[in-house]
Curated annotation (Swiss-Prot):
Similarity remark: Belongs to the BRR1 family.
Protein's recorded name: Pre-mRNA-splicing factor BRR1
Record keywords, A-Z: mRNA processing, mRNA splicing, Nucleus, Spliceosome
Superkingdom to which the source organism belongs: Eukaryota
One GO cellular component term: small nuclear ribonucleoprotein complex
Pfam families in UniProt: SIP1
Organism: Eremothecium gossypii (strain ATCC 10895 / CBS 109.51 / FGSC 9923 / NRRL Y-1056)
Record flagged with keyword DNA-binding: no
Chief place where the protein resides: nucleus
Length: 322
C-alpha cells in the first residue's frame, strides 16, 4: 500500500495518505477503513456546509451517500420556513460575535443606576395590580430622581417585567440593598429547580454565558432536554426559546461523541414540538445585543433554527426527517 496525494476529502478536508485501490491491498483493510470512516461520520460533529443541505422548502440533497444513510421509505422531510444557507450564515455571524471577548458586568454607573431605578418605579406605577412585594419596591423608590434625562436608557417593557418579577422574590429593607442587588452579577443556577425559576424571569445574555463553564452549559442542555416540551406549551415558551438559541450560540463547534449524543437528545425533543402548528406561530424574540449585530432572518423560529443548527453544524442531518 503506497503513499498517495489524492484529492481532498470533501467532508474531512484531508488528502488520502495511502492508495487503497491497488490490487495488492488486503480487502479486509479496505473494509476496516470504510468502517472507521462511517463511525467518524456518525459520532463526531462533522461540519458539512449549509449548501450540502440545499432547500426548496427543505428538500435535502445527499451529494455523498456515505455521509448519512438515506431516509427510509415513509420518512418525511421537515419543511423549514427559511433558506438554509441564509440562516446558517446569519447564525455563524451572530455566534462569532457571541463568542468574542467582552467585559464582565461590574455594576452600573450612577447615571445608569438611577435611570434604571426610575424606570422600575414608573413600570410598577403602570401595573394594573400590585402585590406586597411590588408595593414595597415602589415605596423604596418614591424619592429617586434621575441624574439626567436620557431617553436612550429607557427600559424595554418585557425586560422591565422580568426584572420586577425577579426583584419581587426578595424583600428589600433599604434602597441601598436594592441598588446592591441590581449591581450584582446574576448567579448561575446549579440545579433543575433553580433553572425553572431562573429562565422565565431573566433574559439570557452573552455576559452570563461567558461565565458558564462546559459542565454548566451541559447542565442547562440537560435541563432543556427534560423540560422544554412541557414549558413550550405555557406562557414561558418565548423565554425557553430565547435560552435555547443562546445555548446553541455558546456551545463549542467541536464536541465529543457523548456531547453530540446529548445535543441529538435535545434536538429530538425540539422536533417533537414542531408538530404543533400553534407553537410554530410564536415569534423569535431575542435581546437587542443579537438584533444589533444582524437582524433575524424572516421566517426563523427557535425550534426550526435548532434543528437546522444541529443538522448542519453538528452533522446530524437525519434529525430533519420525521
Amino acid at each position: 500500500m503506497g503513499h498517495t496525494s489524492g484529492p481532498v476529502d470533501p467532508v474531512f478536508g484531508q488528502c488520502q495518505v495511502f492508495d487503497c485501490s491497488a490490487a495488492e491491498v488486503n480487502p479486509e483493510v479496505v473494509k476496516y477503513l470504510a468502517h472507521v470512516r462511517d463511525e467518524a461520520l456518525h459520532t463526531v460533529g462533522v461540519v458539512p456546509s449549509a449548501s450540502n443541505l440545499r432547500k426548496r422548502k427543505i428538500e435535502i440533497s445527499y451529494d455523498d451517500e456515505e455521509v448519512v444513510k438515506r431516509p427510509s421509505e415513509g420518512e418525511k422531510a421537515i419543511e423549514l420556513p427559511f433558506d438554509m444557507d441564509e440562516v446558517i450564515s446569519w447564525f455563524d455571524q451572530v455566534k462569532e460575535d457571541a463568542l468574542s471577548e467582552r467585559e464582565a458586568f461590574e455594576g452600573y454607573d450612577e447615571e445608569t443606576l438611577n435611570t434604571l431605578l426610575v424606570g422600575i418605579r414608573d413600570y410598577i406605577s403602570r401595573m394594573s395590580s400590585r402585590d406586597e412585594s411590588t408595593n414595597n419596591l415602589i415605596k423604596l423608590l418614591e424619592g429617586v430622581q434621575p441624574v439626567v434625562t436620557n431617553e436612550a436608557l429607557e427600559l424595554d417593557e418585557k425586560w422591565a417585567a422580568k426584572l420586577v418579577a425577579r426583584l419581587g422574590r426578595r424583600k428589600f429593607t433599604t434602597l441601598d440593598n436594592l441598588k446592591l442587588r441590581l449591581n450584582t452579577q446574576l448567579p448561575i443556577p446549579t440545579r433543575a429547580k433553580a433553572w425553572k425559576i431562573h429562565i422565565p424571569i431573566n433574559e439570557p445574555s452573552h455576559e452570563f454565558f461567558h461565565r458558564m463553564n462546559s459542565t454548566q452549559l451541559f447542565d442547562l442542555l440537560r435541563y432543556l432536554t427534560d423540560n422544554i416540551v412541557e414549558h413550550y406549551q405555557t406562557d414561558s415558551a418565548t423565554d425557553y426559546g430565547q435560552w435555547l438559541v443562546y445555548l446553541l450560540l455558546h456551545l463549542p463547534r467541536q464536541l465529543t461523541a457523548n456531547e453530540i449524543s446529548e445535543v441529538r437528545g435535545l434536538s429530538k425533543k425540539v422536533r417533537a414540538l414542531i408538530i404543533d402548528h400553534e407553537i410554530l406561530k410564536l415569534p423569535m424574540l431575542l435581546p437587542s445585543e443579537i438584533e444589533d449585530v444582524s437582524p433575524i432572518p424572516r421566517g426563523v423560529n427557535p425550534l426550526h433554527l435548532a434543528l437546522a443548527v444541529v443538522a448542519v453544524i453538528y452533522g446530524q442531518r437525519d434529525i430533519l426527517f420525521l
